[in-house]
Every structure is written in C-alpha cells, then in structure tokens.
A protein has these predicted regions:
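Beta-propeller-forming repeat regions
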Residues: 21-204
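N-terminal export leaders
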Residues: 3-7
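Hydrophobic helical h-region of N-terminal Sec-dependent signal peptides
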Residues: 11-15
Length: 204
C-alpha cells in the first residue's frame, strides 16, 4: 500500500514537472508556431494586435536567425521625423515569403499599419539599421535566406508613411561602414563569381 501511494505521488510530481509533455513534438513543428499563441504585453502586444486586426488573421512572427537585432519587432524613428515608428517581421497562411509591416501611432497613440511589403524569401537571416542616405532617416537592411540556401539582401526606405525597396539582390556577405568618409554609411556587397573570383560592390 505504501509503495502504491509512493508511485502515485511520483507520477503526479513527474506530470507537474513536465507540463509541456501533454502532446508529442513532431518533426514539422516550428518554434515560431509554439510562440504564436502567447499574447505579448506593452508596445509589442499593441503592435501584434494592430497587425492582426489589419490582417484579419493571426500573424506568425518571424525571428532573425542571427545578428544584433533578434526580435521580430523593431522600434525606431525610421523616417527621421522625431516620432517612433515600428517594423514587424511576419508571415501568414497566405504568404510564402516573410513580410514586413510598417506602423505609426495615430493621434490617440494607437499603433496603425501604414504599409506592408513582401520580402525575398521565407527566412530572415539578419536585420540591421543603416544611414545610407542624406537626412535623418535610417534604412532597414534585411538579409534573407531561401530554402535552397541562396542569400538575398534588401534595403528598405520608409518615409512619409510609404516604404520603398531601394535595393534587392543576391549576396554572400555584406558590410555597412562609412568607408568613403562622406558622413553616411556605405553598403559593401561581396559575392563569388563562377570562375572563383570575388566581386565587391560599393553602394554609396
């Protein structure tokens, strides 16, 4: 009898320690699928709600694989007007590639989607900000990774509530640095040629 009580207690304790084991993990389960359900708080929660309301469905947030910015949310004064803007990386059931939503606050302080743009692949490899143009605006530099292993780079400019892709091309490595001494940052793209040589492009 004592042994039976002990086994029952041990089983209950084990179940208490493993609350996530009520369903089996399958190979096709994505981490992002598991992170979709929780409702976020603060600005992130407000951005998530604003995006879902605009889409009419629940967006799946996309996390960059590497780099300094590892969140699907980016809060920054992108257009240089002194007010904070936001960019959100996501996909939906209807989109095969990653999309980016750009949001601003309205007069009441609520986040509103201004525009969305479709990215170049289904995975975000890295994200960073760069000041590649004159003025106070900053550009969003996004590296994408396609399923077949190809890498693509896009640079987005967001001004006056509109987003434009000012660069979209394949790459192997890139660097953002003011190497010309002009005050703004420069974009250097590196790729390997068919003959094994290295091609370097400087975009200023």
């Amino acid at each position: 009898m004592k042994r039976r009580h002990f086994l029952s207690l041990a089983a209950c304790c084990l179940l208490g320690l493993l609350p996530g084991c009520s369903f089996p993990m399958t190979d096709n389960m994505q981490v992002e699928d598991l992170l979709r359900a929780p409702r976020l708080s603060g600005d992130y929660g407000a951005l998530q709600s604003a995006l879902n309301d605009w889409l009419g469905e629940s967006a799946q947030l996309k996390y960059p694989m590497q780099g300094e910015l590892l969140s699907p949310f980016l809060l920054q004064d992108l257009d240089g007007d002194g007010e904070q803007d936001a960019a959100v990386l996501y996909t939906t059931a209807q989109s095969s590639n990653v999309c980016i939503a750009f949001l601003q606050r309205d007069a009441a302080g609520a986040w509103k989607v201004q525009q969305t743009i479709e990215g170049l692949a289904d995975t975000v490899d890295n994200v960073r900000l760069a000041q590649l143009q004159d003025g106070n605006a900053v550009q969003l530099v996004v590296g994408y990774l396609a399923a077949q292993g190809d890498s693509y780079l896009a640079v987005y400019s967001y001004e006056h509530g509109e987003v434009n892709a000012i660069l979209e091309q394949s790459y192997e490595q890139y660097l953002v640095e003011d190497i010309t001494g002009g005050g703004n940052e420069d974009l250097i793209l590196m790729s390997t040629l068919e003959d094994g040589g290295v091609q370097i492009e400087l975009l200023t």
